[in-house]
Amino acid sequence: MLKKKQNSKLKIIPLGGLEQIGMNITAFEYEDSIIVVDCGLSFPEDDMLGIDLVIPDVTYLKENLDRVKGFFITHGHEDHIGAIPYVLRDVNVPIYATKLTMGIIEHKLREHNMLTKVKRKVVKYGQHINLGCFRVEFIKTNHSIQDAACLLYTSPSPR
């Protein structure tokens, strides 16, 4: 599963959340596999009149949809999950999260009439998920919201 091809490189692609508060979303790409961590929104600046919320530009994911394997969500704050109902309209792949985080996500999906349209998998701490060439482990961490996780990613790329 985690076999390395010559000249292959792990790409880390921030799609939001840099130099700003909110809109956390990062893609990890290796060969023909892409996994995405978090899918948050941000709130508009004062000069953005008429705008209620800001979602990340996921054009890259839409253009590579056949390679996107899933979303891994670290915790239930809006800046990490708020864009899920909007993004999954175009990039509908499975979501992996801990129990409380998934409960919050399911509430959002229900509000948008999407609950039955999205595959979801509740993950326990210490559990490994294998998707494409990636292996992801959920690790318990402390945060200002319960059931947060840090993620350990393993790919064929050298460390």
Kindly give the residue locations of the regions a language model identified:
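Generic start-of-chain signal for non-secretory N-termini
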Residues: 1-14, 18
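Beta-strand-turn-beta hairpins that frame and shape the catalytic cleft
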Residues: 5-10, 32-33, 128-136
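Divalent metal-coordination and catalytic microenvironments
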Residues: 12, 38, 75-76, 143
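Pre-active-site segment of Zn-dependent metallo-hydrolases
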Residues: 18-23, 30-73, 85-93, 97, ...
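Short beta-strand scaffold segments in enzyme catalytic cores
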Residues: 24-28, 149-152
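N-terminal Rossmann-fold NAD(P) dinucleotide-binding loop
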Residues: 80
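Metallo-beta-lactamase
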Residues: 100-148
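Conserved small/polar residues in nucleotide/adenosyl-binding loops
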Residues: 153-159
